[in-house]
Amino acid sequence: PAAAPANDPEGVELAYETVDWTPPEGARLSDAIYEEYALQSLRIPGAAPHPTKLVQSAAMASVAPPKPSYRPMLPADIRTRLSNAQLETVIYAGEAHVDHLAGAWMVDEHLDNVSAAAEDAASAVRFRRGFMLGDGTGAGKGRQSAGIILDNWLRGRRKAVWISKSDKLIEDAQRDWSALGMERLLVTPLSRFPQGAKITLTEGILFTTYATLRSDDRG
């Protein structure tokens, strides 16, 4: 079945405040391997703590992350759908994505060869910075990923690719996208299209696997 017409929620910039974090007076690096995780460089009014306990290494807990300035565009009720730790991820991902990597590049017509170019060269492109999410089990990486896509979606960037290790995990991706108030069928499997055929979607999240990307065109 085709995805129903999207009835998108209205996007609003997520309100938060940055804070100067200092370790508690008299605190010292503990002998423990892990410390309980808490937001250090920002506060998100109205956001709930994560429903399960999160931890981080004691060394990481002793240093606050840099203060962000990026404000994601998200539904007004997002605080009821994502925890403060998950919203923090969406903020820092956006902080990375608004910037570019150094240098300019030429990409060939097949999109598989890249070479350095002068920044003022005709047809030169720049690449956006990436963001690596290294959270472990229980942090809700699916919902965090969906939140990052939703931020872009509500800014008008309505095409995304979701790559996973198994095609069976599309149900998880659809669940996480739907949990943010979006139409689950907007997450469309690449397997719906013949290999090598043009993908005609005007908007949506194309779900595929690493194995599919490695396979040859059968056309």
What are these regions (language model features)?
Residues 135:
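The Walker A (P-loop) glycine that initiates the GxxxxGKT/S ATP-binding motif of P-loop NTPases
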Residues 1-6:
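Acidic, low-complexity intrinsically disordered tails
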Residues 139-151:
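Motif I (Walker A/P-loop) of helicase-class P-loop NTPases
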Residues 30-40:
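Eukaryotic nuclear, charge-biased low-complexity tracts
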Residues 11, 16, 21-29, 48-82, ...:
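SF2 helicase/translocase NTPase motor core
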Residues 80, 88, 92:
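Walker A/P-loop-proximal flanking segment of P-loop NTPase domains
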Residues 92-103:
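Phosphate/ATP-binding catalytic cores across multiple sugar-kinase/actin-like superfamilies
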